[in-house]
Amino acid sequence: MYSARRRGQQMHNPWFWHRTVVTRWLPMMALPLLTSVPAAWPQPEPALPPLSSEQVVQHLMEKNLERAAALQHYVGKRSYRLEYHGFPASAEATMEVEVNYDAPASKHFTIVSATGSKLIQTRVFHRLLETEEQAGDASNRKQTELGSENYTFSLAGTEGPNYVLNVEPKVESKFLYRGKIWVDGHDFAVTRIEAQPAKSPSFWTTKSMIHHTYQRVDNEFYLPKENKTITSVRLGGTATLTIEYQSYQVTAAKPLALARKPVPSAVGFAWPDGGSNQEVANFMSSRR
């Protein structure tokens, strides 16, 4: 009777439950977990081949040309947002845009909706679209291409599946940048950019930081995912321009193997939305 009553008391004793679970049941419960843990651990990524910066850039140029020659048409959506906080007053605006791309470098934009500051819409967003439409011209592309004619490259190291390269412009131009690029070690495509303009686009801006990321589309093409530019204003204030790229649909493309071409002196890859810093600077100057 005593032992039964004692067992009943133990059943309602939190410490008894704690001791019983910890000493008896947890080891048994943990056994199947422990035996399955090694299979669940993430496997280390294979080390990248030890390539020089020249070799990485050469592969990048070749693959960019293949992808550019293969990509014939796509559609997509973009969300533009600019937030300015500072002197003389804060302002913000957004715009939703649809884009149609046709090879080799033609883009057509349709504005779906817009909210906020009319000044930002006209002085920044509209001009960004106009600049990008004009960027398809061969002479304009040549000024901004990420290649040996415009940049000097050096290997900074590796990070996961990417080679990391330092990029230095050969001339001080507001259309060129200095910073780092991340190049996928398998596809040899730019996946990320962290940089700043080689030359300030305006007296009114003191510093701009550019953050670009890219996404793989249809397992073959690398297209922009997000573009964020943070600009500091000389008289106080910060402007943050964010462009998000969504809903890509590649509607026409050639097989990459059939798109191979000889490598020219410059790679077929330009910094996306290269006029963003200039248009933000124009907006700043209009508020003085």
Model-predicted regions and their roles:
Residues 1-23:
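N-terminal secretory signal peptides that target proteins for export/translocation
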Residues 38-42:
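Sec/Tat signal peptide C-region and signal peptidase I cleavage site
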Residues 2, 34-35, 285:
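Intrinsically disordered, low-complexity segments enriched in Ser/Pro/Gly/Ala and basic residues
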Residues 43-178, 185-191, 198-207, 218-221, ...:
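Structured extracytoplasmic
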Residues 193, 225-229:
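Beta-strand-dense domains in secreted/periplasmic systems and polymorphic toxin scaffolds
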Residues 25-36:
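Bacterial N-terminal signal peptides
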